[in-house]
């Protein structure tokens, strides 16, 4: 098992008049090697969970287990530091994570911060920059001279340079054009195929259907549904009630089903729809 949340509650500014409950009795597991999507409206608790996974927050009650490390409200910084090496968190606007004077230095910073020699850190940085599609001619440039899409790739390379076992992504393609979005999602797919555990927060149900093998639905700080995307998206009415919807092809097939067309199961991918026509 990669990650397990057990009866987790979290309250921002706990013990003050401004206390705000963000999570209530959340229990879920993220298996090692899985591609898990976390979906829900703004304010549902998704981003709070991501920060718990990375140790940026600790639970008010309950526990978060990442491999062999258990995090509770009383955990020490040394335990949390270990989690941050295992779980790489890419924020929604990952370019905000950039701060060094050159692209190469920025990506090499993380490994060096965890005790890797400068020589090895630079070697790893070069490898990860190549992996995310940043040309070597840009390595000595200021990252702030790059395009928004390039800056995001540099930030992702910086996380990958720390060799995390789990990559946590908070709306990683927000604001990108369709080509840039497709290229990044393809990169994450390849990382997953290489054995990395992926946790994705997204509002795009088509991406959930295409890439994830597990999905959790959050609403108002509670976990309200979970399972395989092919199962969760069968409940079209529920997904519309929580204002998330379903993949475009699923919505189309639901309209056909309402008009008498028979499906054994509603397709969640175009390929499944084509197969249903041939079957």
UniProtKB/Swiss-Prot annotation:
The keyword Cell cycle does not apply. GO terms for molecular function: ATP binding; ATP hydrolysis activity; ATPase-coupled transmembrane transporter activity. It is an enzyme of class 7 (translocase). Its main location: membrane. ATP binds at residues 40-47. InterPro entries: AAA+_ATPase, ABC_transporter-like_ATP-bd, ABC_transporter-like_CS, ABC_transpr_CbiO/EcfA_su, ECF_ABC_transporter_ATP-bd, EcfA2, P-loop_NTPase. It holds the Pfam family ABC_tran. It is found in: Cell membrane. SUPFAM superfamilies: P-loop containing nucleoside triphosphate hydrolases (SSF52540). Residues 3-245 form the ABC transporter domain. It is a peripheral membrane protein. GO terms for cellular component: ATP-binding cassette (ABC) transporter complex. The keyword ATP-binding applies. Keywords: ATP-binding, Cell membrane, Membrane, Nucleotide-binding, Translocase, Transport. Its EC number is 7.-.-.-. ATP-binding (A) component of a common energy-coupling factor (ECF) ABC-transporter complex. Unlike classic ABC transporters this ECF transporter provides the energy necessary to transport a number of different substrates. Forms a stable energy-coupling factor (ECF) transporter complex composed of 2 membrane-embedded substrate-binding proteins (S component), 2 ATP-binding proteins (A component) and 2 transmembrane proteins (T component). Belongs to the ABC transporter superfamily. Energy-coupling factor EcfA family. This is Energy-coupling factor transporter ATP-binding protein EcfA2. It comes from Streptococcus pneumoniae serotype 4 (strain ATCC BAA-334 / TIGR4).
